[in-house]
């Protein structure tokens, strides 16, 4: 069902940030999952960790899914706060929480993150759960903020925290860090269990991006600052089209 040539074409498109190839019909999520380590190896040589996707229950129903999905992060995908990114009409911005973990999946630290997701399908009919999964859920680049020790972290305080995203000083999103999978603690437990179920190897010092809080934002040009309350902020600029 999923040929080596398709994976090669996908890896090339993802690496070069060009349009994805056409997909054969009928690829399921179950078909896609075993191919993700192979694709990730082709794109970046190794995985930087795991990402959660389609964590919104309404979206899951829309796609006919019974649970969220996971993908793998590319080793070359992490960038620094303050980075400049070229404009891409296919980029979406996701406000997330990140968890670092050891090779056994045990949590090390937790903090804010922003993920940049990109899916440029050649045909509308190619946008299916299986094909999205096969593309590592659109994994591209991400920024992690200041990370805090997991064991001493006050998870109860997250319930009162607001994530506020601004573009050129105007608020474009207000959301909660508990919105995706009930927060980073439960997200970590679910994602590690899913990765183990799928037989994925976990990198030492790996990163979990725990899913989109609120709506994904269109990657319009501008200066962005994502405020995570007492956890700090992440900023970046998307250059003009």
Residue ranges and their predicted role:
Residues 2-183, 188-189, 197, 217, ...:
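Catalytic-core "active-site belt" of small-molecule-metabolizing enzymes
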Residues 167-169, 210, 229:
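Short strand-turn-strand beta-turns centered on an Asx-Gly dipeptide
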Residues 202-215, 219:
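Conserved metal-binding segment of the jelly-roll/cupin
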Residues 211-212, 228, 238-240:
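Active-site proximal loops enriched in glycine and acidic residues that flank catalytic Cys/His/Asp
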Residues 222-226:
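A short tyrosine-centered beta-strand micro-motif
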């Amino acid at each position: 069902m999923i040929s080596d040539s398709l994976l090669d074409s996908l890896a090339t498109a993802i690496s070069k940030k060009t349009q994805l190839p056409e997909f054969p019909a009928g690829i399921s999520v179950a078909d896609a999952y075993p191919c993700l380590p192979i694709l990730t190896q082709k794109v970046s040589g190794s995985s930087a960790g795991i990402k959660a996707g389609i964590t919104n229950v309404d979206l899951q129903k829309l796609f006919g899914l019974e649970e969220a999905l996971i993908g793998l992060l590319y080793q070359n995908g992490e960038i620094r706060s303050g980075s400049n990114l070229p404009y891409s009409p296919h980029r979406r911005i996701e406000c997330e929480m990140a968890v670092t973990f050891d090779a056994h999946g045990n949590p090390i630290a937790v903090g804010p993150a922003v993920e940049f997701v990109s899916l440029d399908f050649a045909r509308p009919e190619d946008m299916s759960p299986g094909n999205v999964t096969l593309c590592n859920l659109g994994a591209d680049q991400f920024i992690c903020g200041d990370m805090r020790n997991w064991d001493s972290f006050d998870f109860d305080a997250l319930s009162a925290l607001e994530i506020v995203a601004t573009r050129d000083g105007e608020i474009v999103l207000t959301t909660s860090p508990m919105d995706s999978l009930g927060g980073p603690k439960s997200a970590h437990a679910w994602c590690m269990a899913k990765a183990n179920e799928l037989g994925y190897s976990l990198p030492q010092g790996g990163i979990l991006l725990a899913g989109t809080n609120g709506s994904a934002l269109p990657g319009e040009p501008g200066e962005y600052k994502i405020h995570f309350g007492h956890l700090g902020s992440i900023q970046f600029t998307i250059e003009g089209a």
